[in-house]
């Protein structure tokens, strides 16, 4: 033993041990450094990143839909309001088998194939952890049945929502419009406008009328709640809530009672009536018949119901007051007279003898007057009172289409009126350039003549006729027709402000009074074409009627409504205002093909009596269309 120990080199072994220990220590130190560096990177450098990831798994933002603003009429009557409805919703991430769950729900809440198809479509475009509607507008029985069976459906729940409701149905559809489910086009538009985030919890959006035009005002600001969820996606607790901001309530210039009254008068007719206050431009009534119930669209109209509306020959989907285009006919004669006087084409003393026709100079072409035997010697006033066509044929010929189109454009024809509805057409005020572009033909002198009496290529909407009438009433001062009266903001009413537009012509020329006096004669003097309707009124009315031909008559052919198909009969138009010396109301009316009941003058008188006298009589006599055709010009 002693011999073996004498050969061991303890110094070398000690040095080797020290080296190994040093290497091990350095290795441990290096590994510890790497660990510390990684801990530093995780805890310090990337702390925010990992905290965010953790919170994204743990914390969810749940959007809260704002309450949509209420729409009121001028007297504070709600025209569009919100009602609580219940719908069943599913969060697919919380459901083990979506299809089995849907099948099981069929017997519980009467789920249909259409409901399931709508759910799948909505799911395809929704974000994760979004609650998706499965069936809307549940009945009390369906809610109760689900409550009893809820334990069978984790991830499915019934929620209450505010749903739009229109209590007056078809009476206001073409004005108020409606909201309906947000579709792909809406999503694309909202995204392009940078507004999509504000609709995270909203299912409906304004599609038509006031609901569409003032969507940004009515919708409000979406809120949200911050909640903590577990690994199964179930909410553990609420961390924070930012309440939504309700949309603003708005008040319209409309008078609901007047709107309903006029709709009753027009029942059965294809017609439109616009009633305004010429002092402000506020629209008191805007009626288009036939109409339809907007509530059909709120929950999503069925294909059958929509096809019925779309294929209805009476076109109830069209707002005739703003989208219907018709020859304005003789209703424009007062404006043509003011234009010709202002342009120096005629004077107050200009006269013309009317034998019952007017002949185009240098041609054998004759243009007939509605009165076969003629009106005799005419001046400006008498030509308006008797609605003499020949006088205005001559005026149109002398003015020429360029000046005539320019002046009628000042009265708003051929342009949008500015009314706060997106559903509006501009009609057509013909020009040389328009005809060349449309028909690839030049403008002939013969084209100008019928324009002088509101015929030919000229088309206009009832709202344009209303705006032109207000310009005349106000001696050339322009009032833009509008439906918004005020918006409720912070407990205050913020009124709508009339935009400034340059006046038409010289407001002090006196020509306006001359034209209005002619309209006064139409309604009050024995030779006036509408004398029989208005002369007996206890207040003074000024009016101008018109007849728009749907098809042309042959030479020497007499119009007989009884021998013509209903759809080919003349349209009947009328504009009027009252009281004459201090106008408070202006009315424009169109009865397609003469309407289905009383004559246009009878209806106009009844509307004015209702406004001025409170007369609510709607039991009016039906009139012979052939007789009415001979009287309304």
From Swiss-Prot:
Membrane topology: Single-pass membrane protein
Periplasmic side: 43-633
Cytoplasmic side: 1-21
A cellular-component GO term for this protein: plasma membrane
Gene inactivation effect: Temperature-sensitive mutants grow as normal rods at 30 degrees Celsius but grow and divide as cocci during prolonged culturing at 42 degrees Celsius.
Recorded catalytic activity of this chain's protein: Preferential cleavage: (Ac)2-L-Lys-D-Ala-|-D-Ala. Also transpeptidation of peptidyl-alanyl moieties that are N-acyl substituents of D-alanine
Pathway: Cell wall biogenesis; peptidoglycan biosynthesis
Keywords linked to the UniProt accession: Carboxypeptidase, Cell inner membrane, Cell membrane, Cell shape, Cell wall biogenesis/degradation, Hydrolase, Membrane, Peptidoglycan synthesis, Protease, Transmembrane, Transmembrane helix
Keyword Cell membrane carried by entry: yes
UniProt record similarity statement: Belongs to the transpeptidase family. MrdA subfamily.
Name under which the protein is recorded: Peptidoglycan D,D-transpeptidase MrdA
Lineage start: Bacteria, Pseudomonadati, Pseudomonadota, Gammaproteobacteria, Enterobacterales
């Amino acid at each position: 033993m002693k011999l073996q120990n004498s050969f061991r080199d303890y110094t070398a072994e000690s040095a080797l041990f020290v080296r190994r220990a040093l290497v091990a220590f350095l290795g441990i130190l290096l590994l510890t450094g790497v660990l510390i560096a990684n801990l530093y990177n995780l805890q310090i450098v990337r702390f925010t990143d990992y905290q965010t990831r953790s919170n994204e798994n743990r914390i969810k933002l749940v959007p809260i839909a704002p309450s949509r603003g209420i729409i009121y009429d001028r007297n504070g009557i709600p025209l569009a309001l919100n009602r609580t409805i219940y719908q069943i919703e599913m969060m697919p991430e919380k459901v083990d088998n979506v299809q089995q769950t849907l099948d099981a729900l069929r017997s519980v809440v009467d789920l249909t194939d259409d409901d399931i198809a709508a759910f799948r479509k909505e799911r395809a475009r929704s974000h994760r952890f979004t609650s998706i509607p499965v069936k809307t507008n549940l009945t009390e029985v369906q809610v109760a049945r689900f409550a009893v069976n809820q334990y069978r459906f984790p991830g499915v729940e019934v929620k209450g929502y505010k749903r739009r409701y229109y209590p007056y149905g078809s009476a206001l559809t073409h004005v108020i419009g409606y909201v309906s489910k947000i579709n792909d086009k809406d999503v694309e538009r909202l995204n392009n406008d940078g507004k999509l985030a504000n609709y995270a919890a909203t299912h409906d959006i304004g599609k038509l009328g006031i609901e569409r035009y003032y969507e940004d005002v009515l919708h409000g600001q979406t809120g949200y709640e911050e909640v903590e969820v577990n690994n199964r996606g179930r909410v553990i607790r609420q961390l924070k809530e930012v309440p939504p901001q309700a949309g603003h309530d708005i008040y319209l210039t409309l008078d609901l009672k007047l709107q309903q009254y006029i709709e009753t008068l027009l029942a059965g007719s294809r017609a439109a009536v616009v009633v305004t206050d010429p002092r402000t431009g506020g629209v008191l009534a805007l009626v288009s018949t036939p109409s339809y119930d907007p509530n059909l669209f709120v929950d999503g109209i069925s294909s059958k119901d929509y096809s019925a509306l779309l294929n209805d020959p009476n076109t109830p989907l069209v707002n005739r007051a703003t989208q219907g285009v018709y020859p304005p006919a003789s209703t424009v004669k007062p404006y043509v007279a003011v234009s010709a006087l202002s342009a120096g084409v005629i004077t107050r003393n200009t006269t013309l003898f009317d034998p019952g026709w007017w002949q185009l100079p240098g041609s054998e072409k004759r243009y007939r007057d509605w009165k076969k035997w003629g009106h005799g010697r005419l001046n400006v006033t008498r030509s308006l009172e008797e609605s003499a066509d020949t006088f205005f044929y001559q005026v149109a010929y002398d003015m020429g289409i360029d000046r005539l189109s320019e002046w009628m454009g000042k009265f708003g024809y051929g342009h949008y009126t500015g009314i706060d509805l997106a559903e509006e057409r501009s009609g057509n005020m013909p020009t040389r350039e328009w005809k060349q572009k449309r028909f690839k033909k030049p403008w002939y002198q013969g084209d100008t003549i019928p324009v002088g009496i509101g015929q030919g290529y000229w088309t206009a909407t009832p709202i344009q006729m209303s705006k032109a009438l207000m310009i005349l009433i106000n001696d050339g001062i322009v009032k833009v027709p509008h439906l918004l009266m005020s918006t409720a903001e912070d407990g205050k009413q913020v009124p709508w402000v009339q935009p400034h537009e340059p006046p038409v012509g010289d407001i002090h020329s006196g020509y306006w009074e001359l034209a209005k006096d002619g309209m006064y004669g139409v309604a009050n003097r024995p030779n006036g074409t509408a004398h029989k309707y208005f002369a007996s009124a206890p207040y003074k009315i000024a009016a101008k009627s018109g007849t728009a031909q749907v098809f042309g008559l042959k030479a020497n052919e007499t119009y007989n409504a009884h021998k013509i198909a209903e759809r080919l009969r003349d349209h009947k138009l009328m504009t009027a205002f009252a009281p004459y010396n201090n106008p408070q109301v202006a009315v424009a009316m169109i009865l397609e093909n003469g309407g289905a009941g009383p004559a246009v003058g009878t209806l106009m008188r009844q509307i004015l009596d209702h406004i001025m006298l409170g007369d609510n009589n709607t039991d009016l006599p039906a009139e012979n269309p052939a007789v009415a055709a001979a009287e309304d010009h």
